């Protein structure tokens, strides 16, 4: 068995029976641990013995800073290194996503787990989530500070608009693909979207696709700006990204909107 204690959660010492992984309570944070152990077992990597695990983290829970993905990837690293399993960092990211999808019942993307598993100091990652092809982009801040602020709005992916937005995008993709042979919204560029947006019948779905298409373009522009050290352009793209998330994708919320708008009013803020 595995004994787990979290200094953050303040619970008693919790026990997980090796090989008997069940979701007893959907809000139980140990489901993320169980899910990763379950994902190893699905790959026929069974833990030969248990362990005692003491956990502490400095990410605020539920702040949209990938604390669940961080826990999943951490458990993956521990299990791989302790038991000598042959899995790559990308494998661990995918297993974390699989744990959320199939064990925890949360429909999530791969970005969080990939960033945690593959992160590199002083670099951003340009990731193609369709192919998992990636490129490290050096970040040279040159006197500019990157500030991470907590809006204090609690975020749970399972309770967020993620699943609803994903369904809207998938429905829109079905509509568009009847006119042109695409398999994902990332196959659309802005010019093609402008030509075929009438194939999407619902105005809300149109705005969701507009966000996806323009965000892809902004991401590529942002990578180029970082490579060239053009931080002002990068900041402008970040601002445009938030505005699109707020107005077209509608996932930011009043707290995040207020925080970003207050930041934009400060002298020296690039985005």
Language model regions located:
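ATP-binding N-lobe of GHMP and related small-molecule kinases
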Residues: 1-69, 73-89, 94-95, 108, ...
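C-terminal nucleotide
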Residues: 2-26, 123-271
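Flexible interhelical turns and helix-capping residues at alpha-helix boundaries
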Residues: 44, 104-107, 245, 249
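Short, internal active-site loops enriched in acidic
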Residues: 56-62, 101, 190-193
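Short amphipathic alpha-helical interaction patches enriched in hydrophobic/aromatic residues
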Residues: 79-83, 100, 242-245, 249
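Short, well-structured alpha-helical segments that form the helix of a local strand-helix-strand
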Residues: 88-100, 233-241
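Hydrophobic side chains within alpha-helical segments
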Residues: 115-116, 218
């Amino acid at each position: 068995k595995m004994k787990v204690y979290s200094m953050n959660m303040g619970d008693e010492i919790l026990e997980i029976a090796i090989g008997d992984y069940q979701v007893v309570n959907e809000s139980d944070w140990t489901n993320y641990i169980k899910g990763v152990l379950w994902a190893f077992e699905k790959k026929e990597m069974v833990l030969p013995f248990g362990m005692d695990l003491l956990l502490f983290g400095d990410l605020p829970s539920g702040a949209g800073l990938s604390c669940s993905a961080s826990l999943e990837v951490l458990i993956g690293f521990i299990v791989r290194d302790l038991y000598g399993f042959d899995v790559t960092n990308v494998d661990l990211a995918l297993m974390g996503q699989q744990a959320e999808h199939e064990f925890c019942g949360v429909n999530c993307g791969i970005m969080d787990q990939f960033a945690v598993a593959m992160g590199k100091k002083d670099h951003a990652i340009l990731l193609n989530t369709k192919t998992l092809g990636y490129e490290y982009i050096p970040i040279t801040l040159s006197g500019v500070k990157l500030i991470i602020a907590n809006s204090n709005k609690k975020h749970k992916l399972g309770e967020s608009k993620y699943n609803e937005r994903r369904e809207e995008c998938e429905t829109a993709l079905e509509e568009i693909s009847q006119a042109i042979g695409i398999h994902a919204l990332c196959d659309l560029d802005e010019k093609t979207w402008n030509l075929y947006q009438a194939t999407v019948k619902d105005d809300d779905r149109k705005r969701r696709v507009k966000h996806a298409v323009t965000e892809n373009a902004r991401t590529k522009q942002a990578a180029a700006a970082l490579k060239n050290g053009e931080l002002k352009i990068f900041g402008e793209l970040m601002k445009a990204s938030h505005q699109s998330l707020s107005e077209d994708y509608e996932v930011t919320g009043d707290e995040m909107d207020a925080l970003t708008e207050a930041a934009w009013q400060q002298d020296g803020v690039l985005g």
